[in-house]
Amino acid sequence: MKSCILWLACSLALLTTVTAEDFTFKTSTAQLTLDDRGFCTSLRDTAGGAEWVIEKLGPFFTLRKNGVNFPVTRLARLGANWRAEFGAAGVTADLQISPQPDFIRIQLVRLSSPDIESLELARLALRPLKRNGSWLGALWDERFAVALLGLSDCVNVTTGGGRLTATVYREFGLEGQGVALIATPTANFLKQIRAVEHECGLPSPKIDGVEAKQSPDVRTDYFFSNLTEQNADETIHYAKLGGFRYLMTYDGTWARSLGSYPINTNNFPRGEESLKAVVDKCHAAGLKVGMHMLTSFVGKNDPLVRPIPDARLLKDDHATLAADLDAKVQEITATAPLTSFPTEGAFYGAAKAGFDLQIDDEIIQYRAIGGTGTNSFLRCIRGFAGTKAAPHKTGTPIHHLAERYGSYLVDLRTTLKNEVSERIAGIINRCGFDMIYFDGGECNSANGPSWYWVSQQQRDICERVRRPLLVQGSGGTPWTWHWFTRGCCDDFAAIAPKQYLDWHKIADSWQAYRNSFMPAELGWWGFLAWAPHQPATTPDEVEFYAVRMLALDSPVSLETNLKALQQNGRTQEMLRLLGDFEQLRLNGTVPASIRDKLAIGEWHRIDNTFRPVNYAVTRISAGGECAVTNAEAAQPLQFRLQCVPGLAPLGAATNRVLLPAAEPLNLLAPSTKAAMPGALAARIEFTKAVGDQFSVFMVGQPSPATSGETVGKPLDLQHHRALAVHLCVTNAPPVGAPPPVLNFQLEAGGKVYRDYYVNLDFVGERTIILPEPTTERMLPEFRPAPANYAFKAAMYGFNYRSVIALNLRWMRAGPANFVCTVKQVEALAELDAPLKQPTLELGSDKFTLPVDLGTEDYAEFRDSTDVRVFDKQGKLLQTIHPPNRVPQLPANTSRIKLDATGGGSAKLTLITLGEPLKYSP
């Protein structure tokens, strides 16, 4: 009996094998096989014979009808086309599947039913390929690449989970849509993409007759500043000094407002004539010019908003007025609960936010939501954004205006999109711009699915431009991949720029662009003047960037403004340094064997050598000493010595108490389910709301504020940037385990932060002074979970004059029984405490500086030159000859003592150099 069953099973298997039909589609580099069920049974590299699909793959085609997915059940020839049957759905799809030398084209010709919501034109489950080019729609490694390229912007290509999928939707059109499948050795990949672009009519822009992504311009830097007619000569000078080939001007510099983009006549007095004259002047100086815009944003000061808001502004929520409303009432009641309306301001991110309503032709800003049934807008500002307060009738629609970063948005389903496009493209064409940066493009996901809507304004503008254009922007999609020339690696960091470059810009952004075969530059990089929340940019930061540019052969974009350049006393020195490195990069002078080494660690260039360099920072008070470590050979002492503010003692009347001793907080270890790092342990709010037109802060609140709550005032900590925390720790972690880390995080208006980390590596009570943020630790050690806070918001600008909360966050958890009691937190008053005639003692040798350093002044001695003394803005105050005998810093550990007349404290940066790497110029 068993033998009969086995014989029958084998016979059925043989019958299946004999009767099944395979359909093969070949290109010059690959072979795709589908069986008569519509399953993909093979995707093979014809040269090497490697198989790239996973065995027992699911259906190649799937459609969605009435909310249910239906896989293909049969595939058969139908004349010149192919018919895919979806048996359970009772639907057929006729497709063209056309092999070409470089790709396979799959196009939907006809669907038998109009009720189809979506159709997967292709689905491939591939063997592991380590590179995910999600922007392009590709999976690849050094051997082989597979991609699905949508043949219009209506095709959604995804790359998640090792699967490539191309889907079309009824919302954007089904019949006529298509996709190109490329499968090829990686060395041929870009060539085959170009073939798809040319043969299928996809965007394939050129710069000076060369494919844009292969243009020499892709390797050049750009200088992003507030270029105006008045400062054009000075800006051109700075740009050429730094080796830049492009200048780009801010949207707020060339335009008076976003949306209708009137020319800013404060900066270009003769309007468009002045703007064109500046572009012409830059061209005459050998520089190309870029335009910055905020894509589809409409400023609240724009004619599209005031005095009568344009009906084509995007709305993202709706309610209905419950009662007649006069022109003065400040509480507005709707007919239903307002639980879907935002309770946070429109700051960082793409979530629905903002507090602006439109009723008829009036814009109204609410400050909170409450009332009986949570159906009232409270503390409303009537006639907001330059509109006129007016009465409104019961039943009138209440629209929530979509808002991002303090601006409204264009409804991209309306003709306003075309009007904005015509305005921008017209200025580019008439004035001769060579570049555009589509900033904030990702915010257009407020219109709907990001894969489609993010590209719409950019596409519409690019199609209207009649001159070569280098295109960059934020918010890429597989369709904008064809339009964009290269990518920018995110905004600049105001603090910890070195860590930000390595751990985010390169590790995240630059690598993501490279994975998608998109050229990339390492900007934006801030060139900064000193402010309470940020130090002035210094040459070692410039060199760090320049070395990475050289190592990766990637250009950079410098974001700054003329005021910052003028305030920073080391601007010319730093731009010359950058220009020298840029020339090295473009000339190909440094061999790849050395450039590969420069991609890791920190390096200092001296003549034709690169030497590993370490900048070790420690704080030291006059009369005290500190241990320093030199991991290299013995060498002359090199340093930067900066006078830091004195700090008031604990309990001083001038301090600001953030947590009083009478209200200690017992912090338990975070839940095992809590997102880490950055889980919130406690929050101390200094204000519930800030009287700013864009701002209501209810972070961490379970429900919106009500009209009965007290509106507080933010704290001014501009001169209280240091924190003193008194802690009691019980139940230390096991010996050898890393200590728990607690973040005393200041939060300012606009959901921006400054992080102060404390290692809880002790048991008992201790007071710890945190003189400044320790943000440099965040990305290497504690990148916060996105659910907790955006790490970039802790690295951007920060307003110490508007601190609204102290957040206590776990960056590293302790054991389950770990308890930390926070007994008091003070913000310490800063004191003006000069460092007079400082002397560094190293063994029996001394290095005396015959100078009085004012608060935040610094003395720098390196490369066996003179000692130079700078103020906090980098202005050169004095040059001092070093002593005849410069102290030698021995290898390994030694101790340095600081003496100064009258006391004071300093930040000592010890500079040590390793063995050189030499190259031939």
Task: Please state what every model-predicted region is.
Residues T295, G299-A389, N655:
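Autoprocessing Asn-cyclization modules and mimics
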Residues F25-L247, D251, P269, A277, ...:
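Carbohydrate-recognition beta-sandwich/jelly-roll modules
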Residues I5-T16:
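Bacterial N-terminal signal peptides
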Residues L275-G299, R312-H318, R548, L552-P649:
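Carbohydrate-binding surfaces of carbohydrate-active enzymes
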